[in-house]
Each structure stands twice: as structure tokens, then as C-alpha cells.
């Protein structure tokens, strides 16, 4: 009987006494098989069917070459490489060294290699390793690797083999529940898939430009039509599309489309995404499709969960992208324009995610420590690009395109990374005992921010038609970016002006006794006004009906610094028209940005809890000002003696935007009546009467708010070493870092 089964299991195989391959039973037990036909000795002893797998097995081993020719070949290759080093060194002696050369950038460009195979890529930045790793990376090495399996079969094997180390590592990252069940039953019905993809195309794709939408549309519907045979990478992409689409829907829409609550749908699709990422072997992937799916998932995840886990996954994806060479521009390796453009889009979206998540966790972006030559994406529409192109399409700067918003954010990322690297270099110089040198060149922070302002105003804002929702969003984001850079720069000046223990330090530019308070109040008033405008535009993004489909994304971009500064000022300023405007803006964004504390880790809560406390105290101050106008007036007189012009209303800078309306809020009307704060007036001593002084904003808050101050937010604002005694006061003289002007 066993012999018959053995014969049936090997149709067409020549009868021989010794088989080519190990039987399945011996291979599973990891024991040596004598490969006897029809049954090996191990199977006879175990009384099991002896089944030999079909096929010819692995490719025959290459005959070993003698050692002498191998050594000679390697020696010749080494001599050639050393010769290239010598030529490069001689060339460097004749030409001045640039900043990029000093970072090792040119070395990497000369000696790196990029292996691209269909939708996969692998990057090696050292030529010494290329030949040695070629066999390991791109040739079969296992016993049964005489043929190259398809992506689908290899992914399925990795997902179903319990002994796969890659699966164990992926399951450790995404949780061991990620290997619990098949994915087929998590796909939506055809009708639901149609609606979800429409929601994705309208709500998500314009903000996360990592795809070529005509190509993605074809891939999506081909996969939906054949779910039973779709490969793991494409299946992962399907689930991330569905997950991000659900993220962009409000609860009522989700209930109508999926017949389940938004919370239930998010839990189901997030589980499916995590399971697909684990089974698709994300940690070792070389697939662009898999990386696109992971980046899309991380772009949507902060709307539901912005814990430290999401930040850690961002770091993981960043390094996966580097192993695939996305930090190198495709033109260096002769890639086609279509592939080069998609690689650029994907890399810069990773940098955007990295910048946002690092800011929320009060850390520097990962990209700041790496050199990249990947150019920003082209300013084109998707219809201008096709896989068959041999030359890149011409950019369109006469009107806005699909990539306008992405490029606005790329401009900000580039400037932020340059400023961060400059700050590190200045700090390192200071630690060495030398004085930071500030030159009036293009390498100063002042000039970098001026150039950013000029690019946004001259290239992007003029082509944005604010009557078009997507262009309205792009214009608003550009103006928020300028306001944020202005706040960082001005706060650096304030930090350098502060007095330590009542005395000015020698390495800070000390204001004269006659102008100390006046200068501090003037800068603080400018900070207050700019913070209000940032919150005003942010409130418009959260409440405007014209861009309601993008509200899900705006909710995740909390302007921590501006909000904290406005709330702290409301706790100390007297009642005025400007404060009423600030209160309206704060109320709008506070409700829109409200954090679900049950889904956040301590790092995020370390930012949100002070905001909650500041909001409660600001409400208390407002109530006290309304019920005891005498106390409010006294406080106002104390401040106004310092600078009578401080609270004079200034004209609005965003007059073309509609004023945020409570009735437009997607998730219902905002609370217009602040809740009462437990405790009496004595429980918050001096809340409505503490005047502003020249000792600095956080010092005033220390006395007003007690132990919980703006500390977490101050860590997010760098102190620039270039604001020093010699250049600090003059570096911003005549420098307009304000928000964009409109004709």
C-alpha cells in the first residue's frame, strides 16, 4: 500500500534506486535521508508514507575554481578600486571641497550600486561588497531553490511556515495575533470596495501622493476581481487603501457604507493591515508595493493612534526605504522617469511622516542624520506621467497640480533639515570652545527662511485658486508653515533675551535697561498675533465645508506651540478684542484637535495634558474677567503701563478665508459655553491679575500656572546659536518673516 502511494506521488519520474531529492518526511524532521525508492529507511521505521517532492531539485553546484585565479582576480579588483581612490584624492586636491563632499556624499555616489528587478530594489553603498554579496542577494541558495518562485508563492510559504524566522520577527513587531487567520474574509464586498476606493481617491490620495493613480486604479480593480490569487504585497496594499478610506469617513458615512460603526471598521481593517504586513514580510521586503502600503498605513494611523509605536514603525520604514535606495535619486542609476518619480514621491512622504512624528515626540527627525540626493517630485499631474516614458515630463508652474501640496511640504522639510544640521554644527563648534561664526551668506538661518518664504510666495501661493478646495488647502498649509518658522525664529530671540537669576548673561545680547521690557513685550505681542493667525487658519481647515473631505488629515496636525502660547497669554492678558478673537480660535481648534487619552502613550499625553490644564485656567480667567471686570481692568492697567500699544488690534492677515463657523464642524457643534472650573477664586491665586513682564513667557507662566508650565513645548522649539550678542539683535532687522502678503 505504501509503495503504491509512493508511486502515485511521483508521476513521470524515472524509476531509480536513489532519488535526487530528500523525502518530505525526512525534511520536516530535519534528518538525513538515504533517498531510496520507493521508500527510504527512515519512513520504513516510522511506518509513514514516503513521498518525494517532484522536480529536479536545486541547480548543480558550480565547479570550484582553483584558489590562485580567485586570489588574482580579487587582487586585480582591489588594485582597481585603490586606483579610483587615488584619482579621487588627487582631484580633491585641485578642487575646493564642498559641504556635500565632506559628508561623504560624493564617495557614496561613485561607489554605490542599485539592483532593480521589476517591482523590487536593493541598494548597496560600497563597491567592495557588491561582488561578494551578489550570490547571497540575488541567486538561489536553498536546497529547493533551483527555480525562482513567484512573489505570491514565496510570500505564502513565509506566512504559513511556522519555523520561518522572518515571520517570527514580523509577528513580534505587529503582534502574534497577526498570524491568527487567513485574510480573505476581511475583504469588503464588491459594492463596499467600489465606495471605499472612491473615498480613498477623493479624500486620501490627494494628501498622500505616493501613487500614480491611473496605474493604481488598474491594479486595484484587477486585484479585486481575483482576490483568491492576489499576491501578498498587493493584498496588503488593498487593506491599507480600505483602512485609510475608513479613517477619512465620519461615523455616519461609515455606518451607511459598511453597516458597522467607524470604531468596529477601523479595528477590523487595522487588524487586516497588520496581519498582511506581517505575512508579507515587511522587515525584509524589497517590494515597492509593500513599502507603499506601509507608508500609506503610517500616514493614516496618527488619526486613530499616534502612540510611540507609530513613531517606531516610521523609523523602521525609513531604514527599509534606505535599503531599497530611495534616498538616492533614480537618475543616478539610469532608472526610467516613471520609476524615478514614484521613488521620489515615496521617499519624501516618508520624510514628511518622519518630521511630524518626531515633532510630536520632541525628537529630531531621523532624516536629519542622513545625506540624501533624492530630488523632490516634479510639479505635474498624474496624467502627465506614464510608465512608457523615456524622458521626464515638463513641470507645470502656470497653475496648481496634483503635487502642489506635497511640494509645499517638501520645501518646509528641506529648510527644517538644513536648519537642524546647521544648529548641530554650531553647537559642536561651541562645545569645542570656539565662538559660533555667523556670516551674512546663504548658509545662515535668516537666509534659509527668507528663501523659503520667497519660494512659497513666488512659486506656490500665486498659482493656488482658493475657490478650489485642494488649492485652498495647499495655500493654507503654506501660510501655516511660514507662521511656524516665524514663531521658532522669534522665540529663539526671546530665549536669548531672558535674564538668568535677574541678571543678563554675557553670551546673550542684553537689552538696555530702558528698552528691556519694551522689546520683550513687542516680540511677545508679535508672537501672540502670529499664533492667533496660525490657529485661525487651522480652525478653518477643521471646520470649512469646502474642504470637509480633508478634515481627517488636519485633525492630526496639532499646532502645539501656537496653541500653548495663545492659551498662556490668555491667562495673563486683560480682556480685549484681540483676546476675544484668540479665544474663538482656541475654542475651535481645541475641540477639533481633542485627543482620546485612552489611545495615546505618555509622550503624546505629556503635550496634551498641559494644554488641557491651560485651557481650564484660560476658561477660569475668562469667567473671572466677565464676572469681576474691576480685577480685569486693574490687570490691564498694569500691563498697559509697560506698553500702551501692546494690545491695539492689528488687521487680519487671512481675510480671504472664511471665518470658522461652529455649524460647519464635521463632528457636530462645538461647545460654546465653557464648563465651570471646580474650586474658588482663591484656588488659583492671581490668575486674572498677574501682569506681563520682561522676564520671559515661561517665567510668568511658572508663577501663574504653578508646576505645570510650557516645558514640554519649549523642547520642541530650538534655540539657535546664531542669535548671539553680536548678531542676535541685528540678524532679524528688516527681515520680514511674517505671513504671506496678498495683492
UniProtKB/Swiss-Prot annotation:
Conditions for induction: Expression is repressed by glutamine and at alkaline ambient pH and highly induced under nitrogen starvation and acidic pH conditions.
UniProt keyword list: DNA-binding, Metal-binding, Nucleus, Transcription, Transcription regulation, Zinc
DNA-binding region, residue range(s): 23-50
Keyword Ion transport: no
Chain intervals with Polar residues compositional bias: 624-635
InterPro entries xref list: Sec_Metabolite_Reg, Transcription_factor_dom_fun, Zn2-C6_fun-type_DNA-bd_sf, Zn2Cys6_DnaBD
UniProt function note: Transcription factor that regulates the expression of the gene cluster that mediates the biosynthesis of bikaverin, a red pigment also considered as a mycotoxin.
Pfam families given in the database record: Fungal_trans (PF04082), Zn_clus (PF00172)
Annotated region described as Disordered, given as residue ranges: 421-445, 623-643
Gene3D superfamilies (UniProt xref): Zn(2)-C6 fungal-type DNA-binding domain (4.10.240.10)
PANTHER family linked to this entry: UNCHARACTERIZED TRANSCRIPTIONAL REGULATORY PROTEIN (PTHR31001), ZN(II)2CYS6 TRANSCRIPTION FACTOR (EUROFUNG) (PTHR31001:SF57)
Location relative to the cell: Nucleus
One GO MF term: zinc ion binding
GO cellular component, one term: nucleus
Effects seen without this gene: Leads to decreased production of bikaverin.
Coiled-coil ranges from the UniProt annotation: none
Keyword Disulfide bond listed: no
A GO BP annotation: DNA-templated transcription
Protein's UniProt name: Bikaverin cluster transcription factor bik5
Amino acid at each position: 500500500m505504501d509503495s503504491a502511494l509512493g508511486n502515485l506521488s511521483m508521476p513521470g519520474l524515472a524509476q531509480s534506486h536513489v532519488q535526487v531529492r530528500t523525502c518530505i518526511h525526512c525534511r520536516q524532521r530535519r534528518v538525513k535521508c538515504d533517498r531510496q525508492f520507493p521508500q527510504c529507511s527512515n519512513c520504513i521505521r516510522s511506518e509513514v508514507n514516503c513521498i518525494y517532492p517532484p522536480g529536479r531539485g536545486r541547480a548543480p553546484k558550480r565547479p570550484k575554481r582553483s584558489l590562485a585565479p580567485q586570489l588574482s582576480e580579487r587582487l586585480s579588483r582591489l588594485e582597481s578600486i585603490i586606483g579610483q581612490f587615488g584619482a579621487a584624492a588627487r582631484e580633491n586636491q585641485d578642487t575646493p571641497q564642498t559641504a556635500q563632499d565632506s559628508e561623504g556624499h560624493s564617495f557614496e555616489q561613485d561607489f554605490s550600486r542599485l539592483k532593480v528587478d521589476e517591482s523590487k530594489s536593493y541598494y548597496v553603498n560600497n563597491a567592495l561588497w557588491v561582488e561578494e554579496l551578489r550570490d547571497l542577494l540575488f541567486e538561489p541558495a536553498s536546497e529547493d531553490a533551483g527555480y525562482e518562485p513567484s512573489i505570491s508563492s514565496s510570500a505564502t510559504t513565509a506566512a504559513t511556515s511556522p519555523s520561518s524566522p522572518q515571520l517570527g520577527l514580523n509577528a513580534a513587531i505587529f503582534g502574534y495575533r497577526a498570524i491568527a487567520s487567513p485574510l480573505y474574509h476581511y475583504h469588503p464586498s464588491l459594492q463596499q470596495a467600489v465606495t471605499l476606493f472612491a473615498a480613498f481617491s477623493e479624500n486620501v490620495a490627494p494628501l498622500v501622493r505616493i501613487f500614480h493613480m491611473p496605474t493604481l486604479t488598474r491594479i486595484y480593480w484587477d486585484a479585486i476581481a481575483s482576490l483568491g490569487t492576489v499576491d501578498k504585497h498587493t493584498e496588503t496594499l488593498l487593506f491599507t487603501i480600505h483602512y485609510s478610506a475608513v479613517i477619512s469617513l465620519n461615523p455616519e458615512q461609515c455606518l451607511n457604507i459598511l453597516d458597522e460603526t467607524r470604531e468596529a471598521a477601523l479595528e477590523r481593517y487595522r487588524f487586516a493591515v497588520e496581519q498582511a504586513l506581517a505575512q508579507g514580510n515587511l522587515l525584509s521586503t524589497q517590494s515597492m508595493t509593500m513599502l507603499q502600503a506601509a507608508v500609506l498605513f503610517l500616514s493614516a494611523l496618527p488619526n486613530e493612534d499616534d502612540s510611540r509605536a507609530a513613531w517606531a514603525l516610521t523609523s523602521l520604514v525609513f531604514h527599509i526605504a534606505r535599503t531599497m535606495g530611495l534616498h538616492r535619486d533614480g537618475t543616478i542609476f539610469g532608472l526610467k522617469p516613471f520609476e524615478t518619480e514614484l521613488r521620489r514621491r515615496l521617499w519624501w512622504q516618508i520624510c514628511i511622516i518622519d518630521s511630524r512624528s518626531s515633532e510630536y515626540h520632541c525628537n529630531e527627525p531621523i532624516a536629519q542624520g542622513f545625506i540624501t540626493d533624492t530630488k523632490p517630485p516634479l510639479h505635474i499631474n498624474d496624467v502627465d506621467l506614464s510608465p512608457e516614458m523615456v524622458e521626464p515630463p515638463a513641470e507645470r508652474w502656470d497653475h496648481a497640480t496634483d503635487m502642489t501640496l506635497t511640494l509645499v511640504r517638501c520645501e518646509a522639510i528641506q529648510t527644517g533639515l538644513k536648519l537642524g544640521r546647521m544648529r548641530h554644527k554650531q553647537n559642536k563648534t561651541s562645545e569645542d570652545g570656539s565662538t559660533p561664526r555667523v556670516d551674512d551668506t546663504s548658509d545662515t538661518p535668516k537666509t534659509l527662511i527668507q528663501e523659503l518664504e520667497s519660494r512659497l510666495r513666488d512659486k506656490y501661493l500665486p498659482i493656488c485658486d482658493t475657490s478650489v478646495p485642494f488649492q485652498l488647502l495647499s495655500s493654507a498649509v503654506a501660510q501655516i508653515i511660514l507662521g511656524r518658522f516665524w514663531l521658532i525664529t522669534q522665540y529663539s530671540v526671546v530665549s536669548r533675551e531672558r535674564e538668568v537669576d535677574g541678571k543678563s548673561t554675557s553670551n546673550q545680547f542684553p537689552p538696555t535697561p530702558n528698552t528691556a521690557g519694551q522689546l520683550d513685550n513687542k516680540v511677545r505681542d508679535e508672537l501672540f498675533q502670529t499664533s492667533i493667525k496660525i490657529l485661525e487658519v487651522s480652525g478653518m481647515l477643521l471646520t470649512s465645508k469646502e474642504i470637509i473631505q480633508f478634515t481627517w488629515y488636519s485633525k492630526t496636525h496639532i499646532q502645539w506651540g501656537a496653541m500653548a502660547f495663545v492659551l498662556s497669554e490668555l491667562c495673563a492678558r486683560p480682556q480685549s478684542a484681540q483676546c476675544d478673537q484668540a479665544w474663538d480660535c482656541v475654542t475651535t481648534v481645541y475641540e477639533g484637535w481633542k485627543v482620546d487619552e485612552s489611545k495615546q502613550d505618555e509622550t503624546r499625553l505629556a503635550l496634551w495634558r498641559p494644554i488641557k490644564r491651560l485651557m481650564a485656567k484660560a476658561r477660569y480667567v475668562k469667567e473671572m474677567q466677565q464676572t469681576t471686570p474691576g480685577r480685569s481692568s486693574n490687570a490691564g492697567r498694569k500691563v498697559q503701563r509697560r506698553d500702551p500699544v501692546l494690545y491695539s488690534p492689528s488687521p487680519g492677515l487671512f481675510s480671504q478665508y472664511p471665518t470658522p463657523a461652529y455649524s460647519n464642524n464635521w463632528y457636530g457643534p462645538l461647545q460654546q459655553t465653557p464648563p465651570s472650573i471646580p474650586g474658588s477664586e482663591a484656588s488659583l491665586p492671581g490668575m486674572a491679575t498677574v501682569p506681563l513682564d520682561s522676564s520671559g513667557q515661561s517665567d510668568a507662566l511658572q508663577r501663574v500656572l504653578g508646576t505645570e508650565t510650557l516645558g514640554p513645548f519649549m523642547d520642541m522649539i530650538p534655540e539657535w546659536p546664531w542669535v548671539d550678542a553680536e548678531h542676535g539683535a541685528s540678524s532679524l532687522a528688516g527681515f520680514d518673516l511674517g505671513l504671506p502678503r496678498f495683492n
